[in-house]
Each structure stands twice: as structure tokens, then as C-alpha cells.
Amino acid sequence: MSIEANKEIVRRYQEIYNSNQLDRLSEVLSEDLLTPKIMPGIPQGMEGAKVAHQMMVAGFPDYQTVIDELIAEGDKVVARITMAGTNTGTFMGIPPTGKFISFTGIYIARIANGKIVEHWGEEDGVSLLGQLGVLSL
């Protein structure tokens, strides 16, 4: 696939998440997706991707991710992202604060046969927890 086609797969992936249409994830994610950096306690694969997203939406019902930049080479696409939402639900055991939060992240997606087969992500969890008042910064 071309670099532009791979970028489009990543864009569709974010659109599916942002619209909370998890039943459409199979359009862009491999069933046996490798997610080495997923949150502790979350299963690997597409099921883990769904669980992680549902956890975010439970704590931040208006949660959205904006792609700030895409860089691609070969079969990999790097996305620099900003995630934001209002904390009106319990998140990882933290009671709702009502605060709007925004934090950044970056991930690398490897594409094969038109689907994301590997996903490595890093998010600024310190900023997220600081904005929720859990960490003193």
C-alpha cells in the first residue's frame, strides 16, 4: 500500500473511535492486533482496543482525539495527537471532577494488508492525572 493509503487508514481509525462506532474497528484493525504498550490489565488485540476506548469514554463521555500530525514511511504511520474531554464519569477509580482536560500523545501504527496490525502508543498520563487533581505538578 502507498504511504498516503496507510495515512488514510489511521485517519479512519481515529474517525471510528471519535464517533464511538467500535463495531466498525474491524475495518481498520487486525483481529490479532499487537498492542505492546496498552494499559495494564487491558487484553491484547481488538478486544483490548475496545476496552481501552470504553474506559476513556466512561470517564470522559465527550472524549475526542485530534490528529495534529501524521508522518509515514514504509509500512508505519506516526500520529501526534491531542486527546480531550470533560471528566463527568469515574475514570480508573477516580471520581468525576467536571474538569475539561486536554493531553497529548503519539503512536506508531504498522499497516499490513490494509489494516493496523501493531500499535505502540505513549500518552502524557502525568498531565492527565495532574489536570484531574490526582497528581500535584
Residue ranges and their predicted role:
Residues 1-137:
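C-terminal and inter-domain tail/linker signature
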